């Protein structure tokens, strides 16, 4: 039985690929024994037949058929010929989706350096060779020679750079009749870099560096440590330094660099095809020049152009002039496809679109509890549709899924009742990008609301770093019982009061909440409607406010026979009055107390504002609940 994809490997590792590994990616042996995989022609499709050219960038023999179960020449059609390789065109009869993963390769006529390892920061080539980056660049781009073997010359040193004139002068001395010089070898271009890297013994270099590090200090020591770290990494991964010089280039599958026909008969193509075409053209031209034994200067110029073409393919604009297409637009290289927000990793691998998710603008929901969020009905019915359908069938309201979907589309009133049942106790996850810490995604109990905006409790905003000026948030529905229970126990907003970074409360009132509390409890000394009125209890005062008999900031007297706790340490009465019946009335700063002669409380009135009554009652009700 075939294993699931995730069980066929343990982990993904990014590293240097050897030339043999690159060949393995693209090379296949057909049943008739023919090896295919090498792309040798720059052509893409035939302009008359609109079929891919053989051995070109869209070759069906290398990458697989363009149409399902059909070979290039049309001899074999239909699925019954599965796995057969056409004896005429050599195309395997299989599904066209293999063109999404089958690769090819280009065998280079001359080695080229990988621009990432040359021009990256740090430059691994210059670190390993222990040469300045400028010198390595001059060698790679055919501006200077490097001594590979000084021979018996006393004036030359290993890895010494020579200009064109200096090398010509030494050549004259070597070939002179009375010359005693011999064994001198110099190189230029990526071939010379490859030779230097091949001669590097990593174990010996690492041992030598460790000894030097002990004796050195300061800047020199830091440089040696950096070099040792790179060498140790090469040894640990089993990679060879000369793999940074390419002799084979992989050609990515054609469906990842497509060519599509537009309405007017013209074709739109990926920039990669143009960059690959440049490499193949220059590579083929270099091969022909080498076959006809062209002058060294012409061959060298072609090698430099091949190096620049490969640089543009891997990372356009990293070095030299940027290759541009129509309208002077820089062509997108392999690096451009990988890197950045719209790149393959962040756009397609890390940030995939997922089912059972939605996105909308957030607005404040002041009437929500801290663990609740307002979910628009339109969004909720879409997200919870499978649960609603299951419930409708279970209740016997419909007989099958198709009927349930029609019922939902009609907006039947029963659907909304079922939806209410389904979402009860089913938490949803809210996420606000960028998710910089674990509180960037939290669980909430959904409450159905009208409109199209997600309602969020203002107290959870600091955790999400959200505000209500147009921010958007994503909603995800946990499907399995395990994920639902985990969301409820670990991710519910009311369980995330403290910041995991500092341990301090992250849920704190701010902005309009603080302003609202201030406005509610502030006093206004000007004449207010209903000021100095007497009310039998708190409810009586609130009822008067709702009827418009008293203003929010008006001072009123409210009867409250409970014990009053005050911040003032010695709360003594300002005035005391004794009535004819023997009762005593004590006047404090913010209250009046009437007691019997022996000190028993008869009644007590508090001097406060309606706003403070509302504030106090809200806090009390919350604490009791």
From Swiss-Prot:
Q: Does the keyword Flavoprotein apply?
A: no
Q: Which reactions fall under this protein's catalytic activity?
A: RNA(n) + a ribonucleoside 5'-triphosphate = RNA(n+1) + diphosphate
Q: What is its EC number?
A: 2.7.7.6
Please tell me which top-level EC class this enzyme sits in: transferase
Residues annotated as binding Mg(2+) are 467, 469, 471
According to the UniProt record, which cysteines are disulfide-bonded? none
UniProt keyword list: DNA-directed RNA polymerase, Magnesium, Metal-binding, Nucleotidyltransferase, Transcription, Transferase, Zinc
Q: Could you tell me which SMART domains the record lists for this protein?
A: RPOLA_N
Q: What does this protein do?
A: DNA-dependent RNA polymerase catalyzes the transcription of DNA into RNA using the four ribonucleoside triphosphates as substrates.
What does the similarity note say? Belongs to the RNA polymerase beta' chain family. RpoC1 subfamily.
| Name this polypeptide is given | DNA-directed RNA polymerase subunit gamma
